[in-house]
């Protein structure tokens, strides 16, 4: 299974982090050049996006989020063009497990058409997974169907097949939702089910967001600068991010 790593050209620190891991773990990967939404002009955004949605949800469809949606769309297009049965779409701020190659090999054999597999996911509630669908994977992880897939978020790492990739591209051209609004893609019948790997084998790296949901670009840059200049602030912020996302990955069996 090929991995499609999304990375902004200027994010050299992130690329170095990811390439060191992928090479060490012997993962077949290609780099997908991410699109920096903050560099898109008004005319470009108007031509690439559903402006009714951008106007209605400016906090979510921010320039950074629009760039992320375009970047994920490009990664999905690369998968389709490569004629891969399925592939891993991966963002560039992740700590990978040492057994990732084994996990991907198992998931490739278990992948079924018209589904999405989330290796990293987030939910605003205790997320229910269907016990009768669970399949054991390396190191105590289990792959199971979500009972409430519409509540799932995060596009940090997911496995997708060609048919689902094509439908997601079609549904989000022009960009009308963020790259991780799986509820919208489910409603549009891009996939029939979502399976989650629980607990998630991926961890977020302690790197500031390059997207900046719901923040002004200047404030995001200022916060980044402060965290880099003041190690204690950076450590505290990193711990808060880790604790926050850990709370959003709790699940229960039903």
Range-by-range predicted roles:
Residues 1-90, 94-254:
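An acidic/histidine-cluster motif and surrounding catalytic segment
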């Amino acid at each position: 299974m090929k991995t499609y790593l999304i990375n902004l050209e200027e994010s050299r620190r992130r690329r170095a982090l990811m390439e060191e891991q992928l090479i060490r773990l012997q993962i077949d990967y290609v780099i997908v050049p991410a699109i920096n939404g903050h560099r898109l002009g008004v005319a470009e955004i108007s031509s690439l996006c559903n402006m009714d949605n951008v106007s209605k949800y400016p906090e979510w469809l921010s320039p950074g989020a629009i760039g992320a949606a375009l970047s994920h769309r490009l990664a999905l297009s690369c998968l389709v063009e490569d004629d891969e049965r399925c592939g891993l779409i991966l963002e560039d701020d992740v700590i990978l497990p040492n057994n990732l190659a084994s996990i991907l090999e198992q998931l490739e054999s278990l992948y079924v058409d018209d589904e999405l597999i989330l290796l990293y996911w987030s939910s605003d509630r205790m997320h229910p997974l269907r016990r009768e669908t669970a399949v054991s994977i390396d190191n105590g992880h289990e792959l199971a169907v979500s009972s409430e897939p519409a509540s799932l978020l995060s596009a940090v790492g997911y496995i997708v097949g060609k048919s689902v990739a094509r439908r997601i591209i079609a549904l989000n051209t022009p960009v009308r939702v963020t790259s991780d609004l799986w509820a919208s893609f489910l409603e549009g019948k891009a996939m029939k089910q979502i399976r989650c790997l629980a607990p998630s084998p991926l961890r977020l790296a302690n790197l500031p967001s390059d997207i900046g949901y719901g923040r002004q670009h200047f404030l995001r840059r200022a916060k980044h600068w402060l965290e880099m200049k003041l190690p204690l602030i950076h450590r505290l912020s990193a711990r808060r991010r880790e604790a926050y996302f850990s709370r959003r990955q709790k699940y229960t069996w039903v």
